[in-house]
C-alpha cells in the first residue's frame, strides 16, 4: 500500500502579511484602514511637532507681513500655533515639490496644508478601523458612527470652511490662541451664535455632559455593596462578572421621584443609546452649520434696528451683537483691508455737482 503525502505549500509573504494585518489576536488591531492610518497620523504628528517648535513666520494674508507661530520665534504654548497656508496659495495643492525652495514652502505655510490633509485622512481611517474591528469581532457598528461626529467637525473647520471661503488661510490655526482667534473671527463674519445648528450643537455638548454626569452619579450612588465599610466600593466589582453591579431599579425610582416618573429610563439599552446619540447628533449639526456658513449661509442677522413711531432706534440685544461683530471684524486682518467687509461692500452714496 502506497501512502501519498502532500507537502503543504508555505504561505506567501503577502498572505502572512494579510493574516497579521487582519488578526484580532494582536495587542493592537491594525486592519486595512490602519495600513493607511499609521503613516498619515505619524506624518501629521511629526510635522506638527517640528513646525510648532521651529517653523519660520508665515505670510498668512498674502501681503508680505509674515506672522510668527513657533516657539523659537517668540511664542509660548498658549500663543503658539501652526499658521495656516498663505492666502497667496489659496486652495492650490501645495506640496514641497511645488515650491521653488523649502524656504518658500515654509514662508507660504506649506506645513499647515500637509498636517491638515494627513490628519483628516488619518482620523477618517481611524473611524474605518473602528468599524473594521467591530465587524471582525461580530459587534454592531455604532462606535464608528459615534466617532463620525468629531471627524465631521474636524473636516468642517479644516477642509470644508477653507473651500467655501476660497483659501486655506481661512482654516483654523493649529494652536490654543489660534483656535480662539478662529472662533472670534467666525462670529464676526458669520454670526454663528445666532445660527440654529450651532445652538443644537451647544445643546448636544452641554446636554451630553449633563446626562453623562447624571448617569455616572446615579450608577455610583446605587452600587450593589459587595465589600465591607473599610474597603473601597470599587473592589466589589470583578471584570467580566455576570451579576449587575448596580441596582437600576433603585436608580430609576430615585430619579423618577426627583423629577417625574417618565423622565427616567427603565431600559438600560435605550438609556445608553440616548447617552450616545444626544451629543453625536448635536455635533453633527454643528459640523453641518460650519459647512453651510462656509458658503456664507450665515446665522440670523437683525441688521435693521427696531425703531419707534418717530424713527428713533430702540436698542436691543441684536444691536449690541452687531456692534460687537463689527468691532471684531475691524481687528481681523487689520492690515489687509481698512474696513470690515460688511462696510466695504456698501455702495458709496452718489454726490451731485
Curated annotation (Swiss-Prot):
Chlorophyll a PD1 binds at residue 198. Its EC number is 1.10.3.9. The modification Phosphothreonine is found at residue 2. [CaMn4O5] cluster binds at residues 170, 189, 332-333, 342, 344. Residues 345-353 form a propeptide. Pheophytin a binds at residue 126. It is a multi-pass membrane protein. Belongs to the reaction center PufL/M/PsbA/D family. PSII is composed of 1 copy each of membrane proteins PsbA, PsbB, PsbC, PsbD, PsbE, PsbF, PsbH, PsbI, PsbJ, PsbK, PsbL, PsbM, PsbT, PsbX, PsbY, PsbZ, Psb30/Ycf12, at least 3 peripheral proteins of the oxygen-evolving complex and a large number of cofactors. It forms dimeric complexes. This is Photosystem II protein D1. The lineage of its organism: Eukaryota, Viridiplantae, Streptophyta, Embryophyta, Tracheophyta.
